[in-house]
Amino acid sequence: MSRRNTAKKRFASPDPLYKSRLVSMLTVRILKSGKKTLAQRIIYQALDIVKERTETDPLNVLEKAIRNITPLVEVKARRVGGSTYQVPIEVRAYRGTNLALRWITRFSRERSGKSMSMKLANEIMDAANETGNSIRKREETHRMAEANKAFAHYRY
């Protein structure tokens, strides 16, 4: 147990173009080797593609996608008397958003296609329409929690 003060949560500053914290959080997930401008360019291009295809505000589409992907419950391993149980716990809002962003970037990288911006745009649009791999991941997480409901009394 640490004797020091707990670290304060640092919230991401809004991005320069959309003035959105969500976009800047996504930028950090896309970022590789410290190339932030490249990550921002990929995201802005992806949002332009979303705007072109849906003819609506891309920020609203992104927020809807994140809302659709955000899990409500997840399982956490808890060791009790020599055996490990998968204990379902509720996901806090900030962690849920983080998981959603992580899944969007992971599954957009795994997609087939030419550019990362195109793959990211497709994943965002799929998530907004409640299809795609990131939605499947959320459903799988919920199924795991449902299956292990019996161990909920081991909650932290």
UniProtKB/Swiss-Prot annotation:
GO cellular component: chloroplast; small ribosomal subunit
Protein name in UniProt: Small ribosomal subunit protein uS7c
Matches recorded under Pfam families: Ribosomal_S7
Function summary: One of the primary rRNA binding proteins, it binds directly to 16S rRNA where it nucleates assembly of the head domain of the 30S subunit.
Organism from which the protein derives: Porphyra purpurea
Residue intervals passing through the bilayer: none
Ribonucleoprotein listed as a keyword: yes
Oligomeric and partner information: Part of the 30S ribosomal subunit.
Family: Belongs to the universal ribosomal protein uS7 family.
Single biological process term from Gene Ontology: translation
Origin superkingdom: Eukaryota
MF annotations from Gene Ontology: rRNA binding; structural constituent of ribosome
Protein's cellular compartments: Plastid, Chloroplast
Chief subcellular location: plastid
Record's keyword terms, sorted: Chloroplast, Plastid, Ribonucleoprotein, Ribosomal protein, RNA-binding, rRNA-binding
Keyword check for Zinc-finger: no
